[in-house]
């Protein structure tokens, strides 16, 4: 699918893409969480990212929209959802919150309450997707915010507000000039869903927009130039980027919270799972395999399913494990006999002389609390995935199981030590 945009808009988009070169590394490597209100600015943002995706410049973004319960217009909210779902092949994360009631409870303005709730939600989602937040602020919004902050007693930092990239929030519309935004607005007929509250002079921001800014613009104020006087476009440092390539270590497995999956639509689930696979340097799931995986999850039973690259395993009541088939946890342990160092799953531990490492044999038991307990039952209770159980190191002494090395699988788990060998280390 390609966005139906004019040649002039396409040229502007291409020019803006070149302008934001310092952010290319971040944009190319991480998915965007687009904050979409339905207004003209967020509409421009959405279509710009649609163009970037169609040009294969970015990974699939997702669309976030919050219904503030201020519009009192259920039909318009439905139209927003229908529009995004029918036009953009991206996951939709639509939330509804009674902001007026919450505002009254917190003793804050509607704008402050809505912004706080929205950003808290956006931060949570961006962390889940290992992505970054994108908002539709531009230079005129910057001037509005400066005056808003100054009226409320702000100081020097009021002039430095709304940076290009801060707190994992990216604002690419600052790369568009006001003339370019006007040209696009005149060239395109994208649906606009304005919030009724934007027209009300009950709110300070709207009074600034309707009375103060027109006077400044009439006197020759240039929002683009003013913004650039106080902001520099700089490449995000390695601390800001989620992961440094030089220090990145692919984990041996990942766990996906099933409660998070249950709250997502099927399209969002695929996006979410594919993000986890990407973190493991694996390819996205095929449509058929993903459907098989969803069918297994719906049954609420334990299951194990595999494709060419990974195992997907879940017990009846716990999270979904994703284990690459080349994972260290699926390879046999190694023993440095000289120093008696046991290595497995990227971890290691020193063992005492007299212990012989091995694997769990069928029906093997360990003496614990005066009882002989099957090791397979212990591993099941500890939620060790079935493919891993076969490779988990066991320490034997005199032909009997003495230690189940759970700490090599997960450092948070203690080793299971047989009754007669508590002092082995």
From Swiss-Prot:
Q: Does the keyword Cell cycle apply?
A: no
What is the primary gene name for this protein?
A: tilS
State where the protein is found.
Cytoplasm
- Domain notes per entry: The N-terminal region contains the highly conserved SGGXDS motif, predicted to be a P-loop motif involved in ATP binding.
Which parts of the sequence bind ATP?
37-42
Reactions that this protein is recorded to catalyse: cytidine(34) in tRNA(Ile2) + L-lysine + ATP = lysidine(34) in tRNA(Ile2) + AMP + diphosphate + H(+)
Organism the protein comes from: Leptospira borgpetersenii serovar Hardjo-bovis (strain JB197)
Protein name (record): tRNA(Ile)-lysidine synthase
Cellular compartments per GO CC: cytoplasm
Q: Which NCBIfam families does this UniProt record tie to the protein? A: lysidine_TilS_N (TIGR02432)
Pfam families cross-referenced by the UniProt entry: ATP_bind_3 (PF01171)
């Amino acid at each position: 699918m390609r966005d139906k945009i004019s040649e002039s808009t396409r040229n502007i988009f291409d020019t803006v893409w070149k302008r934001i070169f310092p952010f290319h590394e971040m944009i190319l490597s991480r998915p965007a969480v687009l904050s979409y209100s339905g207004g003209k600015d967020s509409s421009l943002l959405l279509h710009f990212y649609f163009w970037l995706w169609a040009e294969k410049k970015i990974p699939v973004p997702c669309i976030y929209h919050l219904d503030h319960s201020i519009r009192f217009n259920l039909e318009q909210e439905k139209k927003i959802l229908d529009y995004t779902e029918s036009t953009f092949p991206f996951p939709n994360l639509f939330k509804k919150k009674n902001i007026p009631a919450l505002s009254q409870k917190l003793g804050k303005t509607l704008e402050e309450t809505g912004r706080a709730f929205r950003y808290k939600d956006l931060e949570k989602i961006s962390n889940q997707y290992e992505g970054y937040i994108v908002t539709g602020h531009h230079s005129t919004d910057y001037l509005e915010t400066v005056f808003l902050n100054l009226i409320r007693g702000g100081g020097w930092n009021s002039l430095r507000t709304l940076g290009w990239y801060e707190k994992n929030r990216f604002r690419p519309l600052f790369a568009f000039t006001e003339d370019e935004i006007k040209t696009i607005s005149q060239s395109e007929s994208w649906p606009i869903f304005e919030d009724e509250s934007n027209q009300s002079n009950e709110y300070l921001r709207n009074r600034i927009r309707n009375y103060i800014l027109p006077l400044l613009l009439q006197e020759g104020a240039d929002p683009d130039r003013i913004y650039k006087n106080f902001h520099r476009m700089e490449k995000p440092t390695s601390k800001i980027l989620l992961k440094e390539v030089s220090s990145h270590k692919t984990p041996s497995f990942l766990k996906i919270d099933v409660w998070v999956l249950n709250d997502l639509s099927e399209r969002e689930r695929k996006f979410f799972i594919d993000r986890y696979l990407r973190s493991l340097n694996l390819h996205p799931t095929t449509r058929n395999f993903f459907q098989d995986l969803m069918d297994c999850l719906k049954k609420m039973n334990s299951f194990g399913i595999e494709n060419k690259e990974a195992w997907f395993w879940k017990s009846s009541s716990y999270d979904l494990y994703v284990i690459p088939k080349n994972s260290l946890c699926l390879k046999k342990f190694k023993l440095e006999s000289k120093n008696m160092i046991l290595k497995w799953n990227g971890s290691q531990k020193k063992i005492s002389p007299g212990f012989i490492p091995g694997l769990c044999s069928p029906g093997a038991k360990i003496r614990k609390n005066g009882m002989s307990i099957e090791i397979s039952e212990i591993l099941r209770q500890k939620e060790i995935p079935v493919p891993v159980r076969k490779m988990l190191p066991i320490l034997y002494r005199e032909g009997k199981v003495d230690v189940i090395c759970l700490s090599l699988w997960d450092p948070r788990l203690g080793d299971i030590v047989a009754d007669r060998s508590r002092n082995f280390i």
